[in-house]
């Protein structure tokens, strides 16, 4: 027997891109009562004075008309500024490297937007993320990696709670990106040929250094090796991240062994940037980390220990870890030393295909000693 989906209302977050367009199309084809909503999170114009949000909204309108669904625009600029951008700036001020996409999903797309969707009578919200939702026999929702390994976005969704996931659909999770493009082209959607957006949501394609300098004054300082050699001047600690290679302005010639130079540490109090030679420089290696803002996708005890795998940045293979959880904090011990564990970034836990949740890295340690990363 066919399920009658017509009484189930799904509000789709539509960005004007191909993924969210196909999300809306698939749900409409499956018979759901679909409404499209465009979120305006950032007041912006590109370098030609064109408001990119206006262009994106036109694409949403065109696709919604093609599919035959109602659509609205909602303004979350204040919520975005207060909950995501202020956090982003505070992290950079404290010498850390934040991941605003993780916070945007937690606070905007699956909180502010979810709340708004409920006022439209939504049973569920849906987005174009590459992740999968599976409900077990007890009604508990499990979040699984997207089938397209190169596009899986569970890393960025790792702060979602069971409550949020219960109300969420990810219709693209079982598809390859190439299939999504093909569906859009076959349906003749206005966004079928539109290129994917890159970069942080509110910066887009702009130069990151220039953008950041509008909001945080840069303080130049000394660039040093760990053993105290002065290597010149840095442009401001906020412009560098642990393990970074480019943009240092020092070639291999100063080191004697011609290995490339990397950022290996920061001292915020002295405004010193530490650099060292070699991809696996000893200062870049650590054996454990402390994390806070720990969120699991399911109900868990206040204190427990977990053997699983983890990612410490988006595009990296999983590593085996032991996680000691206490309330919203965790100590994560690595089976093998890890490179460039960066405070402010997300650590995300997995059990096979399932994303279990994650937290924000506060400090890395090497054999119990804190690494000089902030």
Curated annotation (Swiss-Prot):
GO cellular component: cytoplasm
CDD domains linked to this entry: MnmA_TRMU-like
InterPro entries: MnmA-like, MnmA-like_C, MnmA-like_central, MnmA-like_central_sf, Rossmann-like_a/b/a_fold
Keyword set includes Transcription: no
Disulfide bonds listed in the record: 104-201
Binding site for ATP: 13-20, 39, 128
UniProt site (Interaction with tRNA): 129, 345
Stretches assigned to coiled coil: none
Family per record: Belongs to the MnmA/TRMU family.
Protein name: tRNA-specific 2-thiouridylase MnmA
Organism of provenance: Streptococcus equi subsp. zooepidemicus (strain MGCS10565)
Gene from which the chain derives: mnmA
